């Protein structure tokens, strides 16, 4: 069992051992939440692994939400477990699981996180599931030495009961609950350890490291023979002449066969996770994809997406490659992925979102995919067969008559795409010739040493080989044959071969191929050298003489290149290509400006590049499958002719240059800073204003990240603004700019207003930066002035409150004593003039008291400190009470008060006391400034739009617009009122204080209503108060 910590050391920790004994799923994570330090069997099963070794010291890809929840707990620095509800599962199914997370200390004192949850199966067998192999043995032992549960091969160790009892006693005496020593098993001793997990009841974990004795393994695997074994063997023994062949077959059968991938067409859709870096290189992919398409097909980590797409033949329009450059979220992209060992492709749907670091540096994409095996379709390129590394066992060649051998020509080159250097033929296809086979155990069938005994047998074998090659060629090709482009390319190669006379050269080679027209009798040849030696010329003769570059490879491993490729690239040998970097160094899929090319470019040894056309085919190679990549240099004639542009004369050229210079001069003259940014977020150039604004020289800032121009607190906002414009979202349409803080080269800070726009052709950006220092200074001055005004208002309110308190007490005494003296309770005054003086004192005192109260109320309203109790108020009732109070005064002034209330008027939400005060103030003003015989009309209404309206109309003297504005100001009285006072010769004590209308308006607005006044001189005044629908309690 691998890992930085012994398995039993962590299993014996106080925070782990009891849960381990119960069979809980347990997982110990490092604080990066990715590295698995320890896990038990149920824990590995919980996260989709069958064995503990598959997960320990590995990387666990937890969902983002789960990471966030666990990370939040880990920062609390407490050992108490915390419950976290997360969704776990693979594919399209996930289940809500309640995990318990706690901080623990490992044996060496390092802090870690323990993630645990209870499992439905809490048996002893479940507790040690996923543990033990041929060299590691696990068991749970109770207090008396009885084995409760054990790994499959534990019984073969033959540990005695007395040995187990001694181990239990030693574990009980150990202070750390662990004993490590050599343990007697049968006739020898092996290293082991035992840990005491629980005390009541006692349960121990026993770990043994070492192989079981050989005699037990043999006995366990032996099968008893029947009594008549010798007779049976004599009946089934072959003839002596077939013994060598059967011995070879037996040797081949005894070789261990690797486990092959089997595609399940009826499997449900599977979901997998993938990651790519900023350069498009796959950095991670979950095993769910390999479970469907095969491990070789899913082995793309470390490869760029463009290379995988070129090899697998998807994303031919470059749409996904373009999305990887956009750095924006995308989804719903569908491609066809080859299935290992089959002629099928399965649809895969991909989605991804960009990943950034804390410094807003682009880290690549993280996404998921859904692969649907039930919707698999035929792959005309049969790429999956090349990925399998050999011919599938279920492939059977068709039975067709042998055809007459042909000279090397067009058909030979076409056959080359499927059968190059293939000498691994199933024995069932060829008839059994007389062979002299030298047995060599441990070697492949294709490496057996074969000598032909006579020319007749050689001709027979050659004919059958030709038949097999033809049948195999038809079996490995798709039913539709080669595509039109591939067939034309190979025909061109064949034509060149004819012109150069390569057909005669190939016909006269030392080892003729199986498709020659006739085979000359030859003498028996000595055994051929084994495959461990260099490849023989007969396997690569045709490839070596081809005039076009050819590469035979499997993934990143290059098996063979011909001389034409070495000549065109400038490398001396295949080893030089491998040491330089292999396939990746030969091809360049990106142009100098970072954009992905649509065509393939071959890179030479000196760094120069050349465009080529590539044709990829799956072929048989050294008993397995590989890919043959044939390249055809693209000549100038093959390139599309550029569109003919009208030739510009010197005058047009000069005019264009002058126009460009004018634009540059305009940009440099502008007071705003202009910065050009490339798609990577780096500065391309800036104008003079931007250079002066930040204090950078132009060449000093070019190539640096755009974020360097901003303070730390504004860098994220600026880069978010930039990335938001790179897509086609809301920001690209509603571009309203940002306020940011710029950073000068010397460290100073500047308030800026930034607007960024997209450049149409280069996919870059243009940022316009304006210095708003003066704006900020003005804004600060306004803010300070507002604060000063608020402070003054608060001082006034505080002053009025104090004055009110100081005046109210003596004023109440004056009013009270005047009333007491006027009543003559302690004797007659004796003079009527004194009685008039007392009434004047009383009236004046009440007037001053009302003035103080009004001043205090209006100051409280302005400061927002007036206590108001909002409740349901019947407006009709409140106005009715005010009319009843004002009726005596109206009678004395000979003014008629009329009312018109709407029935079923809904209640309003308001302060009852202030509403009555508003009605009294309005009625008092209306009666006071209406001549005898005039009318005051009070009405209420419920409008169609939901408003409740109160109107007070009089037939008084009226006011002009300027007089209305003056009347609404505190302590202001209009001239018309002064004239009326002089005309009527009323006592000044009956006049107002100038606070009536301002106080009324303030109270109305404090009740969330609207106050309006309309008046004309000589025509009267109308005051309207509107309560909006939000303040109306309608049914």
UniProtKB/Swiss-Prot annotation:
Principal EC category: transferase
Record-listed E.C. numbers: 2.7.13.3
Localization per Swiss-Prot or TrEMBL: Cytoplasm
Species this chain originates from: Brucella melitensis biotype 1 (strain ATCC 23456 / CCUG 17765 / NCTC 10094 / 16M)
Catalytic activity: ATP + protein L-histidine = ADP + protein N-phospho-L-histidine
InterPro entries the UniProt entry points to: HATPase_C_sf (IPR036890), His_kinase_dom (IPR005467), HisK_dim/P_dom (IPR003661), HisK_dim/P_sf (IPR036097), PAS (IPR000014), PAS-like_dom_sf (IPR035965), PAS_fold (IPR013767), PdhS_histid_kinase (IPR048231)
Pfam families the record matches: HATPase_c, HisKA, PAS, PAS_8
Single annotated GO MF: ATP binding
Keyword Disulfide bond attached: no
Annotated protein name in UniProt: Cell-division control histidine kinase PdhS
Subunit comment: Interacts with DivK.
């Amino acid at each position: 069992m691998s890992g930085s910590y012994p398995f039993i050391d962590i299993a014996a920790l106080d925070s782990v051992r009891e849960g381990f004994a119960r069979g809980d799923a347990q997982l110990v994570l490092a604080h990066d939440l990715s590295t698995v330090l320890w896990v038990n069997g149920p824990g590995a099963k919980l996260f989709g692994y069958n064995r503990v070794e598959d997960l320990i010291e590995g990387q666990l890809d937890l969902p983002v939400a789960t990471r966030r929840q666990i990370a939040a707990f880990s920062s609390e620095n407490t050992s108490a477990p915390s419950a976290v509800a997360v969704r776990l599962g693979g594919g399209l199914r996930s289940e809500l699981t309640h995990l318990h997370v706690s901080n623990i200390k490992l044996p060496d004192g390092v802090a870690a996180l323990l993630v645990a949850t209870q499992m439905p199966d809490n048996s002893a067998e479940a507790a040690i599931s996923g543990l033990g192999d041929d060299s590691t043995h696990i068991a749970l032992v109770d207090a008396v030495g009885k084995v409760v549960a054990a790994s499959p091969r534990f019984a073969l160790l033959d540990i005695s009961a007395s040995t187990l009892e001694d181990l239990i006693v030693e574990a009980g005496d150990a202070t750390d609950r662990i004993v490590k020593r050599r343990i007697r098993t049968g006739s020898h001793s092996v290293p082991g350890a035992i840990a005491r997990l629980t005390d009541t009841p006692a349960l121990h974990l026993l770990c043994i490291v070492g192989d079981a004795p050989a005699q037990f393994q043999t006995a366990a695997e032996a099968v008893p023979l029947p009594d008549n074994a010798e007779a049976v063997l004599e009946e089934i023994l072959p003839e002596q002449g077939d013994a060598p062949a059967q011995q070879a077959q037996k040797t081949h059968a005894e070789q261990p066969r690797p486990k092959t991938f089997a595609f399940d067409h009826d499997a449900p859709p599977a979901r997998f996770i993938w990651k790519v870096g900023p350069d498009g290189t796959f950095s991670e992919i979950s095993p769910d994809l390999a479970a469907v398409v095969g491990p070789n097909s899913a082995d793309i980590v470390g490869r760029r997406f463009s290379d995988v797409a070129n090899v697998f033949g998807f994303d031919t329009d470059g749409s996904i490659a373009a999305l990887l450059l956009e750095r924006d979220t995308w989804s719903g992209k569908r491609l066809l992925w080859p299935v290992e060992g089959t002629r099928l492709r399965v649809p895969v749907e991909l989605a991804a979102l960009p990943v950034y670091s804390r410094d807003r540096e682009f880290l690549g994409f993280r996404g998921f995919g859904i692969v649907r095996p039930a919707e698999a379709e035929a792959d005309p390129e049969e790429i999956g067969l090349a990925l399998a590394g050999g011919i599938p066992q279920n492939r059977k060649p068709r039975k067709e008559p042998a055809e007459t051998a042909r000279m090397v020509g067009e058909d030979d080159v076409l056959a080359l795409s499927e059968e190059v250097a293939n000498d691994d033929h199933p024995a069932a296809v060829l008839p059994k010739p007389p062979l002299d086979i030298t047995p060599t155990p441990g070697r492949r069938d294709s490496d057996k040493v074969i000598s032909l005994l006579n020319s007749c047998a050689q001709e027979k074998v050659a004919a059958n080989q030709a038949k097999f090659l033809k049948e195999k060629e038809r079996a490995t090709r798709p039913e539709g044959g080669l595509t039109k482009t591939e067939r034309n390319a190979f025909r061109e190669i064949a034509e060149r071969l004819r012109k150069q006379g390569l057909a005669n050269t190939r016909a006269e080679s030392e080892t003729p191929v199986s498709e020659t027209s006739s085979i000359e009798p030859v003498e028996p040849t000595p055994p051929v050298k084994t495959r461990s030696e260099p490849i023989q010329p007969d396997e690569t003769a045709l490839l070596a003489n081809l005039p076009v570059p050819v590469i035979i490879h499997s993934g990143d491993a290059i098996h063979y290149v011909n001389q034409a490729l070495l000549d065109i690239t400038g490398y001396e040998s295949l080893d030089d290509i491998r040491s330089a970097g292999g396939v990746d160094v030969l091809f360049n899929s990106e142009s100098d400006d970072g954009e992905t090319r649509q065509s393939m470019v071959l890179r030479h040894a000196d760094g120069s590049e050349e465009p080529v056309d590539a044709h990829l085919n799956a072929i048989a190679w050294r008993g397995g499958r590989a890919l043959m990549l044939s390249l055809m240099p693209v000549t100038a004639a093959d390139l599309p002719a550029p569109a003919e542009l009208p030739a510009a004369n010197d005058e047009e050229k000069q005019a264009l240059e002058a126009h460009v210079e004018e634009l540059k001069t305009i940009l440099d003259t502008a007071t705003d800073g202009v910065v050009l940014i490339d798609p990577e977020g780096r500065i391309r150039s800036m104008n003079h204003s931007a250079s002066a604004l930040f204090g950078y020289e132009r060449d000093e800032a070019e190539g640096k990240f755009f974020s360097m121009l901003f303070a730390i607190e504004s860098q994220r906002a600026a880069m978010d603004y930039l990335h938001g414009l790179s897509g086609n979202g809301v920001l690209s349409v509603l571009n309203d700019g940002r306020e940011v803080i710029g950073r000068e080269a010397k460290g100073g800070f500047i308030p800026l207003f930034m607007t960024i726009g997209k450049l149409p052709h280069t996919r870059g950006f243009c940022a316009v930066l304006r210095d708003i220092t003066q704006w900020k200074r003005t804004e600060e001055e306004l803010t300070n002035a507002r604060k000063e005004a608020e402070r003054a208002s608060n001082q006034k309110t505080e002053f009025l409150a104090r004055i009110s308190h100081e005046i109210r007490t003596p004023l109440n005494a004056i009013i009270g004593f005047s009333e007491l003296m006027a009543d003559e309770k302690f004797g007659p005054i004796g003079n009527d003039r004194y009685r008039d003086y007392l009434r004047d004192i009383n009236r004046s005192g009440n007037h001053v008291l009302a003035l103080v109260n009004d001043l205090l109320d209006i100051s409280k309203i302005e400061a927002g400190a007036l206590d108001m109790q909002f409740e349901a108020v019947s407006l009709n009732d409140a106005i009715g009470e005010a009319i009843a109070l004002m009726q005596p005064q109206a009678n004395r002034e000979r003014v008629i008060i009329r009312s018109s209330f709407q029935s079923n008027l809904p209640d309003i939400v308001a302060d009852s006391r202030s509403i009555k005060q508003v009605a009294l103030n309005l009625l008092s003003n209306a009666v006071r400034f209406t001549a005898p015989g005039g009318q005051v009309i009070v009405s209420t209404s419920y409008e169609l739009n939901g408003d409740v309206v109160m109107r007070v109309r009089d037939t008084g003297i009226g006011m002009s617009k300027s007089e209305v504005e003056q009347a609404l100001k505190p302590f202001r009285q209009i001239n018309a009122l002064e004239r009326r006072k002089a005309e009527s010769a009323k006592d000044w004590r009956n006049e107002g204080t100038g606070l009536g209308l301002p106080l009324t308006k303030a109270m109305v607005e404090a009740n969330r209503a609207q106050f309006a006044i309309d008046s004309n001189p000589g025509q009267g005044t109308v005051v309207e108060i509107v309560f909006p629908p939000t303040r109306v309690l309608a049914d």
